[in-house]
Amino acid sequence: MSLIPKPISKVSTFTFILLILLSFTIIIAYSSPDSNVESNEPGFDSDLDQLLAVDEQLQEDRPEQQSEAETVSKAQRIVLELNGDYTKRVIDGNEFVMVLGYAPWCARSAELMPRFAEAATALKEIGSSVLMAKIDGDRYSKIASELEIKGFPTLLLFVNGTSLTYNGGSSAEDIVIWVQKKTGAPIITLNTVDEAPRFLDKYHTFVLGLFEKFEGSEHNEFVKAAKSDDEIQFIETRDSDVAKLLFPDLKSNNVFIGLVKPEAERYTVYDGSYKMEKILEFLGSNKFPLFTKLTETNTVWVYSSPVKLQVMLFSKADDFQKLAQPLEDIARKFKSKLMFIYVDITNENLAMPFLILFGIEAGNKTVVAAFDNNLNSKYLLESDPSPNSIEEFCSGLAHGTVSRYYRSEPVPDNENASIVTVVGKTFDGLVLNSRENVLLEVHTPWCVNCEALSKQIEKLAKHFKGFENLVFARIDASANEHTKLQVDDKYPIILLYKSGEKEKPLKLSTKLSAKDIAVFINEELLKPKNGSAKDEL
């Protein structure tokens, strides 16, 4: 499991928010203990085998009496506990070793461990040769460091001693599929009808391939796609009856590929060419539900969607259910162009990082918004959400007719103002599209030095009063935004937008005195057109 978020880039608002969300899912640093107790356990292999043998005998003797706790206990004993030099011996002595690095104090580790144990049980049952192990990286920090475990929880697959970082989902099924793909078993073959129900009990999302023979170009491309995809289980069969059990919508006995998902849009037929790239493209566009519920553990998966224009509905669960059916119809209509995501608005850890971008405080009112991760833009449905208004909003997004949303204060009255107040909604008109040169002061309420600079700007505005081609303006960056107002967090900031060159504003040093700024304005704007300079304050 990848633990360290990629560096945050200013070019993508949605990327930034998803990485914020990852902070709720992942702990990226761990503490080192005062002592590092490490010991060998040379008899652990035989002890483990004996424990598993006892478990299997008990299950045979009283299968109906096994409690859930006993089942979990058995699963956890399948996972080898590593420590000290024993770790290196295990990794070097086995072709495939999956290691979970955890810490006892880490809540996410505690959540993942039973799923990891469940995956270990499933892999053992299907005859996988991978050895599943775990190590307390807090206690055995030296070994954890040597394994390059840099945070908790971390999942690493060692193939002949070389590690691969796990980058899949957090469910047991996700882990099993990923491990199978990486250890040489990307496809499950079903030969008889009797095998199908057992398969359906274990797998809820899968790709079905029906072939006359497991050879030829079409099958080869299917296999290549199975090896390239790390998320979805691929299944192959030569028996059309098996295929129809798995995919009841199957109408033909010819070569066939289809995707099965556990949701409203359960069966999706692939009708493209039999090329690996096209099959993977089909999966990328169709693997998500019509409406994906965002959780702390699936943010990376959501971000992997090739559909980067994403509609997000924030509401309470009951309110979402009331809209569920019409929303599914809308999502189906715009499936190839928009991705639809539901966020429980009562989960502040998930909802608030998004809502704060729109200046929306915590509440229970349904909000519909959208992010375009390619254009770094966001949109907001400002009317009351209803099936009709949501569909109209989505249609506008798909056709590019919805205006971008900028967080903005109300438009102020600037009549007779010596310094124009700019807000998000007026940035285009007053700054970018105006014919005048604009000296813009960017400030925030918490800025220590902003008040002193504001007084200098007011003095300059009075000094240059009467110069029609020069406008003094200011904007509160904490309450207003615009995609072309790209500034750092060091306020105050002075920007000069020269007429005809608005795309490349000049940034002035805030250490300049009022006289220095006056000289700069005169040299940049006034002297070329007017021989009379006005720099004496």
UniProtKB/Swiss-Prot annotation:
GO-annotated molecular function: protein disulfide isomerase activity
Disulfide topology: C447-C450
Active site per the UniProt annotation: C106 (nucleophile), C447 (nucleophile), C450 (nucleophile)
Main location: endoplasmic reticulum
Residue span, Thioredoxin domain: 58-184, 380-526
Top-level taxon of origin: Eukaryota
Catalytic activity, as annotated: Catalyzes the rearrangement of -S-S- bonds in proteins
Compartments where located: Endoplasmic reticulum lumen
Gene3D superfamilies: Glutaredoxin (3.40.30.10)
Leader peptide range in chain numbering: 1-29
Entry EC no(s): 5.3.4.1
Distribution of this protein across tissues and organs: Widely expressed.
Pfam (any one): Thioredoxin_6
Gene Ontology annotations for the cellular component aspect, listed alphabetically: endoplasmic reticulum; endoplasmic reticulum lumen; nucleus
Class of the enzyme per the UniProt entry, highest EC level: isomerase
Sequence motif Prevents secretion from ER, residues: 534-537
Entry's family note: Belongs to the protein disulfide isomerase family.
Function of the molecule: Acts as a protein-folding catalyst that interacts with nascent polypeptides to catalyze the formation, isomerization, and reduction or oxidation of disulfide bonds.
Designated name of the protein: Protein disulfide isomerase-like 1-5
Name of the gene: PDIL1-5
